[in-house]
UniProtKB/Swiss-Prot annotation:
Pfam families: Ribosomal_L28. Signal peptide: none annotated. GO terms for cellular component: ribonucleoprotein complex; ribosome. One of its GO terms (biological process) is translation. This is Large ribosomal subunit protein bL28. InterPro entries: Ribosomal_bL28, Ribosomal_bL28/bL31-like_sf, Ribosomal_bL28_bact-type, Ribosomal_bL28_sf. One of its GO terms (molecular function) is structural constituent of ribosome. The keyword Ribonucleoprotein applies. Keywords: Ribonucleoprotein, Ribosomal protein. Belongs to the bacterial ribosomal protein bL28 family. The gene is rpmB. The lineage of its organism: Bacteria, Bacillati, Cyanobacteriota, Cyanophyceae, Synechococcales.
Length: 78
């Protein structure tokens, strides 16, 4: 299973770790993924989904159905 948000498609970012002496090494910044069981109002069922915390924040603000439609995700497959 890859570390990708099932709702937004967010995945790891390539970055640099910089030491005190300014030596740079490559670093992989992973997405903060959480497994959640969310209630889908329109489908009248629970949805088990692995989402990023940013997506979870968006869901709390505008709702699961609206976030899924914006990102083109079919919640029936979960």
């Amino acid at each position: 299973m890859s570390r990708v948000c099932e709702l937004t498609g967010a995945k790891a970012n390539n970055g640099m770790a910089v030491s005190h002496s300014h030596i740079r090494t490559k670093k992989l910044q992973q997405v903060n993924l959480q497994k959640r069981r969310l209630w889908w109002q329109e489908g009248k069922k629970w949805v088990n989904i692995k989402i990023s915390t940013k997506a979870l924040k968006s869901i709390q603000k505008v709702g699961l159905d609206k976030v899924a439609k914006t990102n083109g995700v079919d919640l029936n497959k979960f």
